[in-house]
From Swiss-Prot:
<feature type="binding site">
    <location>
        <position position="191"/>
    </location>
    <ligand>
        <name>Mg(2+) 2</name>
    </ligand>
</feature>
<comment type="pathway">
    <text>Amino-acid biosynthesis; L-isoleucine biosynthesis; L-isoleucine from 2-oxobutanoate: step 2/4.</text>
</comment>
<keyword id="KW-0100">Branched-chain amino acid biosynthesis</keyword>
<comment type="pathway">
    <text>Amino-acid biosynthesis; L-valine biosynthesis; L-valine from pyruvate: step 2/4.</text>
</comment>
<keyword id="KW-0460">Magnesium</keyword>
<comment type="similarity">
    <text>Belongs to the ketol-acid reductoisomerase family.</text>
</comment>
<feature type="binding site">
    <location>
        <begin position="25"/>
        <end position="28"/>
    </location>
    <ligand>
        <name>NADP(+)</name>
    </ligand>
</feature>
<feature type="binding site">
    <location>
        <position position="252"/>
    </location>
    <ligand>
        <name>substrate</name>
    </ligand>
</feature>
<feature type="binding site">
    <location>
        <position position="53"/>
    </location>
    <ligand>
        <name>NADP(+)</name>
    </ligand>
</feature>
<keyword id="KW-0028">Amino-acid biosynthesis</keyword>
<dbReference type="GO" id="GO:0004455">
    <property type="term" value="F:ketol-acid reductoisomerase activity"/>
</dbReference>
<dbReference type="Pfam" id="PF07991">
    <property type="entry name" value="KARI_N"/>
</dbReference>
<keyword id="KW-0479">Metal-binding</keyword>
<dbReference type="GO" id="GO:0009097">
    <property type="term" value="P:isoleucine biosynthetic process"/>
</dbReference>
<feature type="binding site">
    <location>
        <position position="195"/>
    </location>
    <ligand>
        <name>Mg(2+) 1</name>
    </ligand>
</feature>
<dbReference type="InterPro" id="IPR036291">
    <property type="entry name" value="NAD(P)-bd_dom_sf"/>
</dbReference>
<protein>
    <recommendedName>
        <fullName>Ketol-acid reductoisomerase (NADP(+))</fullName>
        <ecNumber>1.1.1.86</ecNumber>
    </recommendedName>
</protein>
């Protein structure tokens, strides 16, 4: 079993004399910056000129600089930008300021693991990856709690890389919940696999296929939406709260029997073979190469697929039905 580390295992004082630059101020960026600031760390934010996030960061009491200036001032540089832009920003604005003893940090291992970013040998390269969205990282911190994190060391030039990563995780509240040590390879490959096979690709395809099957059979699209999309959250919440057993304990016997007897007919040996193939494409770097090439050529296929998916009939049906949900209007 993997070992979890908690508050008593990490020493935040290690970062006391460090200036931490958060590059990016989106979902994760704002949470990391504010949590570290509230933990007593000296935090600055690096943003591109004209960023709409600059005002938000300044209003939160943070000093904002252009990325290159923030990288120059900082001892620890946490890159919290989309995967596809990290290489260019790193090469042009961060790498020139990586002096011996600095710490380069990430919240996802994609660019390091697949060789898009190759750091100099005289800096620590670490990862701290909260297993939750930024708003949850921030909210739980403010409540005196935290979101579990993964942490990893790719390069330990100082001999303190591990302690520094754990201190950073403590600063954003991770050790309150528990942090788990991994590697850049393991985090990257499992994260991509989960996204593609289960959380995003698999779930989206399953929802659409179920919806389309019912509509094709003559059932009202609104009912198909309720049964195949809307109720997903109800089931997932039960799974998250207590695992599959908790979910099965909470549903009807009819639903549970259907789960056991019909579910395996959906995820067949052929499905598992495709899962293995997708994993192999991730491990070999094939997916990474496809993604990098797609972005280098202006994202034509990605843009077309995004447009096509947005026009699926389930989106129009959902838009009308969600207007009925009073609890969504309160957000």
């Amino acid at each position: 079993m993997a070992r979890m580390y908690y508050d008593s295992d990490a020493n935040l004082d290690i970062l006391n004399d460090k200036t931490i630059a958060i590059i990016g101020y989106g979902s994760q960026g704002h949470a990391h910056a504010l949590n570290l600031k509230d933990s007593g760390s000296k935090v600055i934010v690096g943003l591109y000129s004209g960023s709409k996030s600059a005002t938000k960061a300044k209003d939160a009491g943070l000093d904002v600089y252009p990325v290159d200036e923030a990288a120059e001032k900082a001892d620890l540089i946490m890159i919290l930008l989309p995967d596809e832009v990290q290489k260019t920003v790193y090469k042009n604005q961060i790498e020139p300021h990586l002096k011996e003893g600095k710490i380069l940090a990430f919240a996802h291992g994609f660019n390091i693991h697949f060789g898009q970013i190759i750091p100099p040998e005289n800096v620590d390269v670490v990862m701290v990856a909260p297993k939750g969205p930024g708003h949850l990282v921030r909210r739980t911190y403010e409540q005196g709690e935290g979101v579990p994190c993964l942490f990893a060391i790719f390069q330990d030039a100082s001999g303190q890389g591990r302690d520094r990563a754990m201190a950073y995780a403590k600063g954003i509240g991770g050790t309150r919940a528990g942090i788990l040590e991994t590697t850049f390879r393991e985090e990257t490959e499992t994260d991509l696999f989960g996204e593609q096979v289960v959380l995003c690709g698999g779930l989206s395809a399953l929802i659409k296929a179920g919806f389309e099957t019912l509509v094709k059979a003559g059932y009202q699209p609104e009912l198909a939406y309720f049964e195949c999309l809307h109720e997903v959250k109800l089931i997932v919440d039960l799974v998250v709260e207590g695992g599959l057993a908790n979910m099965r304990d909470s549903i009807s016997n009819t639903a549970e029997f259907g789960d056991y007897t019909r579910g395996p007919r959906i995820v067949t040996d052929e499905t598992r073979a495709q899962m293995q193939k997708i994993l192999s494409e991730i491990q070999s770097g094939q997916f990474a190469r496809e993604f990098v090439m797609e972005n280098q050529t202006g994202k034509p296929v990605f843009t077309a697929m995004r447009r096509q998916e947005a026009e699926h009939s389930i989106e129009e049906v959902g838009k009308d039905l969600r207007a009925m949900f009073s609890w969504l209007k309160k957000r």
